[in-house]
Every structure is written in C-alpha cells, then in structure tokens.
C-alpha cells in the first residue's frame, strides 16, 4: 500500500490572500487594489470641488466671487488657486497657514491644493484600474497607456506649470470660466497658439475626432445584414464568430476616395490610438516648457519691420500687439500686490476695448 504524504489543500490563507480575494472578486463594480487609490481620491477630489463651488469665496485670494452662495452659476463658479503670496505651500489644514482652522483654510485656497492632488492621484488610480482589469482578463494594456495622455496634460497644466512659476496662483482654478481665463493668460504671456507643441496637440485632438467620425461612419456603412432583427442590436449576436462589417468593402471605398486606405485592422486602430495620445503628450511637453518660460516661435524680423513701416502689418504682428494688451490688463488685475502701473494709453478702454 502506498501512502501519500503532503500538505493539506485546505491551508490557512494569509491576510494578503484574503484581501486579494475580496478586492478582486467579480462584482457589479470592480474594486481591485487600484480602487484603494482611485475611490478615496476621486471621492475627496469631487467632494472638495462641490464644496468649494457651492460655499467658498475667492475674495481673499483673487478678489472675486466664485461660489453659488455668492451668486455664481455653473459656468462661473470655481475652486480658485491660493494667493500668490503663499507660493508653493501645500496648504495642509494643520499647516502653519491655516493652523487647523477649516474656515481660514478654505479662505486661503486650501481646497485648490486638496482637489488638485487628490484629483491627480485619482486619475493615476483610474489608469492603474485599467491595467489591473486588463491583466485579470488577459487583455493588452493599451487602454491604460492611452489614458496616460490626459494624465500627462493634467499633471503638466495643474502641477508642473505652477511649480515652474512663482506659486500655485498661476495654475488654472477649477471652473469653466476660470479655465477660459487661464487659456487667455497662456496666450497673452506665452503666445501659446504659436507654440509648435500646441500645434501638435491641436492636430492630434482634431485629427482624432476626424478619424473617429470616419471610422464610425465606415463601420455603419459596411455592416453585414445577416440577421432578421429590426435594428443592429437585435440582428447581431454578441458572441457570433463572424465579423459584423466588411473591411474589404471599406478598403475599396476609401481607396477610391483618397487613393490610399487602411488594409489592416490592427494598423487602423493603432493609428486611431496613436494620433490623440501623441497629440496630448506633445501638449503636455509644451506646457512643461512654458513652466520654464521657454518661448514659442518669434518672427522678430516681422516685428522690427512693422515697427519701422506703418504700412506693413501681418496677422502675426497683430497678434503680438493683442498679447501685449492681454498682459497689460491681466497683470494689473491678477496681481494687485505687485502694484503694477501702466500708462493710460496702453490700457483697454472699458467694455469698448
């Protein structure tokens, strides 16, 4: 008789295995290890934003009303950046600025750093969530890689740019009109629209929108009508073995339209991934350059000629003058502590400009 010796299959699970089983269990909303970062950070970031836009003024940091309580609406409310005098302080509630006083912390702009950092880590948690789920179901990680692009833009605009400047004050506030103002600031002080990295970003985003529209329309146009259902959702079984649209027909169509067309689905879809992700990454790199005050294209010869010849003007020289007007108006408004004084003749004339 043979006796088999070995460990019992019913070994006691350690704490890590128990936590892993619970976190990665198949449920309606997947939690996962990434959820330990994502859910708390997203909760606090959104909660801080809703609290700030509802109740908190920007009077002490920007001299502005910025909450629903003060009469703002969804487009004009914001969680505004801390004052310039606070530089790059983390503005912790228990720090030397607020000293545990929640009201003072809100007045100083503490909610902005709270929302910015929790929001940044929340986005990273969401990317890790995509990695984790992809690994669990044996998918490639391209979704997570693609999501790195908006994370790069967020981190560069909200964190790296103000770190390169004198303080968080120069980051965008979290609000619709506030971000519009930040865009105008970027144009006036950095000539952002003439920056090659911005140009690549625009090409990426608009090119991706065009590709998405073309791709969706082409697939709709070449669907196989192999079912008797009244619409696409009834006509096709999600587990069917055959493809639902004709790549050959699509290729022939676009070959006739443009003379060239994608003949490979992998290359087509990789290109749709590559265009927007690369565009957003280029924009993020450009903003890092602005943090270091790197300049955009300068056509100095045109500026010199325009200064010498009143009859010579280009769209570029007109834009340069417009940027000077933006700087003259915004600097005095946004930085009253600097006591900037500009001659009356260079300032805009009221609502009529």
Curated annotation (Swiss-Prot):
Reaction catalysis annotation:
2 a plastoquinone + 4 hnu + 2 H2O = 2 a plastoquinol + O2
Classify the source by domain of life. Answer: Eukaryota
Q: Which PROSITE patterns match?
A: REACTION_CENTER
Q: Does the keyword Transmembrane apply?
A: yes
Q: Which SUPFAM superfamilies match?
A: Bacterial photosystem II reaction centre, L and M subunits
Residue spans crossing the bilayer: 41-61, 125-141, 153-166, 208-228, 279-295
Q: Which residues bind chlorophyll a ChlzD2?
A: 118
N-acetylthreonine modifications at = 2
Q: What is its main location?
A: plastid
What cellular component GO annotations does this protein have? chloroplast thylakoid membrane; photosystem II
Q: What is this protein called?
A: Photosystem II D2 protein
